[in-house]
Curated annotation (Swiss-Prot):
Cellular localization per UniProt: Secreted, Cell wall; Membrane
Motif LPXTG sorting signal: where in chain: 96-100
Compositional bias segments (type: Basic and acidic residues): 552-570
Protein name in the entry: Immunoglobulin A1 protease
Stated consequence of mutating H1494F: Loss of activity
Modification comment: The Gram-positive cell-wall anchor motif LPXTG is located in the N-terminal part, in contrast to such motifs in other known streptococcal and staphylococcal proteins. The protease could be cleaved by the sortase and anchored in the membrane via the two potential N-terminal transmembrane domains, whereas the propeptide located prior to the LPXTG motif would remain attached to the cell wall peptidoglycan by an amide bond.
Annotated membrane topology: Multi-pass membrane protein; Peptidoglycan-anchor
Modification sites for Pentaglycyl murein peptidoglycan amidated threonine: T99
NCBIfam families reported for this sequence: LPXTG_anchor, YSIRK_signal
Activity modulation: Inhibited by EDTA.
Amino acid sequence: MKKFLGEKQTRFAFRKLAVGLVSAAISSLFFVSIVGVDSVQAQEKLNVHYKYVTDTEITPQEKELIVSGVPRMPEGNEETYYLVYRLNSNAGAKTLPNTGDNNSNTMMAAGLLLTTIGLVVFAVSKRKVQSKFLLTVLVGASVGGGLILSVDALENGSLLQYNAEYQVSAGESLPSPGEISGYTYVGYIKDESIKKLLDNKIPDNQQNANVDKEALNQNKKLDYSVSFDKNGLKNQTVGVNTIEPQDEVLSGRVAKPELLYKETSIETEIAYGEQIQENPDLAEGTVRVKQEGKPGRKIEVVRIFTVDNAEVSREVLSTKIEEATPKIVEKGTKKLEAPSEKPVTSNLVQPEQVAPLPEYTGVQSGAIVEPEQVASLPEYSGTLSGAIVEPEQIEPEIGGVQSGAIVEPEQVTPLPEYTGTQAGAVVSPEQVAPLPEYTGTQSGAIVEPAQVTPLPEYTGVQSGAIVKPAQVTPLPEYTGTQSGAIVEPEQVTPSPEYTGVQAGAIVEPEQVASLPEYTGSQAGAIVEPEQVEPPQEYTGNIEPAAPEAENPTEKAQEPKEQKQEPEKNIELRNVSDVELYSLADGKYKQHVSLDAIPSNQENYFVKVKSSKFKDVFLPISSIVDSTKDGQPVYKITASAEKLKQDVNNKYEDNFTFYLAKKAEREVTNFTSFSNLVQAINNNLNGTYYLAASLNANEVELENGASSYIKGRFTGKLFGSKDGKNYAIYNLKKPLFDTLSAATVENLTLKDVNISGKTDIGALANEANNATRINNVHVDGVLAGERGIGGLVWKADNSKISNSSFKGRIVNSYETKAPYNIGGLVGQLTGINALVDKSKATITISSNADSTNQTVGGLAGLVEKDALISNSYAEGNINNVKRFGSVAGVAGYLWDRDSSEERHAGRLHNVLSDINVMNGNAISGYHYRGMRITDSYSNKDNRVYKVTLEKDEVVTKESLEERGTILDVSQIASKKSEINSLSAPKVETLLTSTNKESDFSKVKDYQASRALAYKNIEKLLPFYNKATIVKYGNLVKEDSTLYEKEILSAVMMKDNEVITDIASHKEAANKLLIHYKDHSSEKLDLTYQSDFSKLAEYRVGDTGLIYTPNQFLQNHSSIVNEVLPDLKAVDYQSEAIRNTLGISSGVSLTELYLEEQFAKTKENLANTLEKLLSADAVIASENQTINGYVVDKIKRNKEALLLGLTYLERWYNFNYGDVNVKDLVMYHMDFFGKGNVSPLDTIIELGKSGFNNLLAKNNVDAYNISLANNNATKDLFSTLANYREVFLPNKTNNQWFKEQTKAYIVEEKSAIDEVRVKQEQAGSKYSIGVYDRITSDTWKYRNMVLPLLTMPERSVFVISTISSLGFGAYDRYRNNEHRAGAELNKFVEDNAQETAKRQRDHYDYWYRILDEQGREKLYRNILVYDAYKFGDDTTVDKATVEAQFDSSNPAMKYFFGPVGNKVVHNKHGAYATGDSVYYMGYRMLDKDGAITYTHEMTHDSDNEIYLGGYGRRSGLGPEFFAKGLLQAPDHPDDATITVNSILKYDKNDASEKSRLQVLDPTKRFQNADDLKNYVHNMFDVIYMLEYLEGMSIVNRLSDVQKVNALRKIENKYVRDADGNDVYATNVIKNITMADAQKLNSFNSLIENDILSAREYKNGDVERNGYHTIKLFSPIYSALSSEKGTPGDLMGRRIAYELLAAKGFKDGMVPYISNQYEDDAKQNGKTISIYGKTRGLVTDDLVLRKVFNGQFNNWTEFKKAMYEERKNKFDSLNKVTFDDTRQPWTSYATKTISTVEELQTLMDEAVLQDANDNWYSWSGYKPEYNSAVHKLKKAVFKAYLDQTKDFRKSIFENQK
């Protein structure tokens, strides 16, 4: 029936009592007449009421009253507006249960009924207007008949919670209607409009009941006063209630009634059932009892709530069922074909045998009951619908399934149905005797005040129960009926649908069709008759009541099977450990044992740790003596609302665990770490055994303590006893300070986390005097500022055997002091010192930068005859600095004290399986006579070391100290051969468990759904297993939830991650599910209710529910208490420095956190609320637990702030619309590890030390401090996995480029096959910047986070096939290119052009190399612009170097955090082997391109350009760059070189003087093109040189020859290895005697002659910057008779070989060590770094290249000239500039024969000889030499004519 908005509605519902708690019920007051009371008008402001309704709740007539728009101004003192909303089409129905009465015709009946039972109900509420109060009193009952009228207009249903009341001043605008999710605002209806409509609709019978309003409105004459005793509230705590509108009226004027409760146990016998078994061996008809039955028991712990000694409700806290033993009867079936029929049993132990209850459709239909899949009941409008009436002849036994349902005692005579005039009203028919007055515990329904928050969906037992008040003295035990209790028995087989009088149990399964609205006067009332005996156990079927004759339509339906829902509880699953804490004297302490039962147990609490879920804090409810495994222990019980524990597959209330009783005194065998420490400190010479695994957390060290046991331990400690191995867990400092002649055996130290400023080791700082350490194993982390050893720092004449260390060692502290770091021992010293049959699995981060700073995989320093044998190391050593003594086995072996080889350290049968940065494989320092035998290393290990070559630092693969190199396939077997050591299995701590959730024993478990249960467990982390199985069975088999494993689920509001659930629980609308394969899906999420402090959500249309891994907890008290302390912390304070572990003199600059630190402090309150919400669960409000959290934060405030600042600084970036910072900081379970504490993790991060928090160490910091807690491998796999989840359709690089503000240019090759490879995202071929800087071979992977978090565009990045360049915009900033758009355009345009040049250069190399060389071009060379930044006033180039503390954004946000401290010098640029650094030159300039080809040659020649053969011994890096493989500086360079990078334009001004290739990308398509070009170029060179030579020998005098010519010789200097085979070219003047020999062209070759024009006297420095002049002949063919040629002759011959045989077959064999093996076979060897190498000689190369064609290089040179001479007759005609004429004349000369050219050459040679300017200091051939000018003109003409020598000049083209 549709109700009208203005109709009065009277609500009586016990459910509302549970919400309000302050209504008053007063009985035995009678009023003669019907009274309606208006509100008292006593206010100074205007009252406005907003009531929210939906358009479905109003009638068509009322819809016509809707006014569009919003209310504007109030017109009266008190007005009501009905705000109408329409439900959006995509929103779900949100209808509250129908519990109200809207039938005005029933009021009289209600009055008569209340008269009969003597019940008066007062509803008291208050409105406060300034200092005055409105008191509305609703009075019910009369003697002869009464009418109850409510004074307020009808509250709506669906949107009730939005109702609001405002006070506004006259003329003030009204508030706007609120926005409601899922609804659209329509308009409003004024209250007066409704009243007018209602005036026309009041029934006659109600009009007759009206009284004189004038009399009733004399408000001042009415004085209603109600008094309550306030004293009754002392020491009582009322449960949590979200709405308490009555409190205001009661405060000070009306006392509150006491709500009390007590707890009691109720025991009910469970009758045993009878089972009939067929026995084929018994004769048919024979019956015998096989087993006698035994009754069971159901024990319920019930909490009874009372007000004024009257019970108002009860709550079943726990139910324990002791199963009944069924009676088993055997029936014989022998010779009978038909088996006997089984009787129906009622055994509760076997609920599947319980016959179904019939569906109930009688009275009480207003209770909250919606059995699953039950068809809607017809609306009931008969007599006393909702009253407690027992139908005739129905005597059901209520128990088991129906236990706790609302029942009626047998003695009450049921009222007959009334069908008269006022059917539905509460009346007493004439023939029916009145019911006796009811005064039981629930007499009096409670009116619901306005604006009550909607009730959540009921999904489990006791929903809606009153929250437990704290410490209430229990009332006397109640043993009466359990009517009204909300009970759902645990895992009981579904009862049949019941249609009798008791339908109305409060159970509402999901997706059930709604019951018809009950409109009777007591709909929803829950009333218990007085003094009703407990109902008997239900043991069988209940027959449905016979329908009334006069109401044949109310026919009982057929029984329908109903499945009983499992009881929903809180269960802590997968418990791994339990920790007990206490508060005493303001300090918190962890207890691993107890001395006695504490008297102040309220100061104790427990932290329950799980292998899968968050820690849970629980208050202690009891500690009692007990035994476990025969040992006396303490049984400790912790409690929380609805918490149960699975004990042997049975649930028990609360959570219990056991704690050891601390032995008062232990002498030899120890089960307490504190006892052990105390005993050893008292007697350092005793013998001690572990009798259990010990927890070092038991001992709290003093500040500054360096170890647990002080002094020199000379006794014995054994970690095993009676065949069991034990461990000591959680050491925070070394166990011993010093071991002296001591013995430690069979001991394991697990989870060590040790830090210290001095030298440290996990077991001891030092072991000396023949100490024996055997079978000792350590795992964990050690961090220090100086020496570190995994076991001991220093072992002096002591033995370590069969021992191991596994973990991380961190020491990146920068100091000049010497130190030693080793995986097992830092320093091993003395002839009796030994490490044998041991191993280390390590990750070492160090900063060693001098030879006295040693780092080794097994030991740092091994000296004084100490020995390491039969041992190996595996893992990684990353030494950031370059010059320390670092190696995979031992860092340093030399004995510094004696400086004698015979006392050096020794290595025997050792193996290095370690990747080493800046070190060697076996030993870090090489010298002759090393005492190393049988050493091995892994070929696949990356071992790099830097060396100084000339003035450049070059990083290259270390070939020193590699030992015997094994293939990776041989490593495992070699390790086993060396030793087969493995760590023993040890006993766990007493409080540790490994109990995993086992769903297989849960009812309805399906093995095929194991993964579904595992996934639901993630979605419901705190619910019991039965609930998980229930929802696991609802997972659809075609859903992803059924097929893939969930790692985590994250709540979101659209794309925003929600962390603080308590503050945003209703805002969440999406659930992001992250699967193990890193796929994800978003499901719709809808908040539906709370269950025991858990917010419960509906997941889309799946039928599933979700609860976050958080309890609803308000942390404001904690936040408010710690906030002042945190905000008082100063970044530059000593407290911060102490936390970082640095002195006051150390700058904090390189942390780059100061700016973020201030921002973090500004938003601390919000951050802390999120952090605490994401952290450990506080299951029950407890001041001791809160204090523990407060204490932890205050004690670690500096570390917490540093950790928060660090994460907010480096992880503030997005994946699309999702910011990852909150995921990293708060959702550390995102990758599946649900038991991580974000608070602890962030504190530990902040405490991890200065070096770990350095910006440049951000990759290691994640891997060390965050990866394990996030269940991830490393930073980059984490970033990639985030991308897979949030941006699955993009590559990592695409995401990266969208996120970074750096300007990125990725220039792919112009070669198709290369470009295709480069487009392979994530491959080694990719030129994606992200792909490259995250590769394992990239040295500066720490660039990723700075690039992702840059706040502005200040850096550019250029990526090409072989290099990755970085530079700052401000490097190009000056007064011509000012900051802003102008500078940006200049930089970005030039960055693109530079990228193309670099691309072209390596396309050139790709085309001329073979397949092996081409593959090596796919690499990653770092290129850096200088740290020289200009401003808008800078002229030309900036010249001042910026330091790391510069405020320049490029330095502040990128270069500084990356931490590459580039050494700046006066060079144009320099290379280090893996990097290129521009200095004077700039990357984006044209000369920067030429510099690129030079420096990249240094980084490419050894492994790539030279075919992988390496540089020829004796040739320095500069030999291969300048004048050989780099591009010429300018297009007019008159040198023999090849332009490989710059494209010139025919229209350029420089075209007339260009002597180099116009466009290398077109000229060189393959190696043959290169050979063709050089060969044709040498046609011109050889021809012109021949002509000049002929002019010299034929035209010049001997004196002129002396001036015009020089000769070249070799000299040899012995090097550091004793070699004197590397030639240095020396240029000398020729003598007259020499000149006299020069009478033919060949004589110039034979006498090693060269031109004096551009070659000056003196030594041609080896490894120098030399070029071969294009127009100054070198006739000589000088070779090195001993070995390697000099720099000048080497370059010239190299190019001549390129012209003759090509790059691969001519040049490469000459300048590389290609023929080294041949040299060895020929007995030509040299020593390099103590190793014998083959010496490649010129003669060997000549013989191999030309296959014996030439006997010497002179013959080769003569042949080359002769080859061209033979073609002179075919010389092409050519026209060139006539250099004899002034250049302004533009005269040209054409020649067709060589003879013509010879004539011109003769003239030029004579002119130069006559001028004789060769020795003039200002002599420049291009201006002062006629020969030079002529040659240049001819060369240029032929260059142009042949289109860059695509054709020969000898083609007889006339």
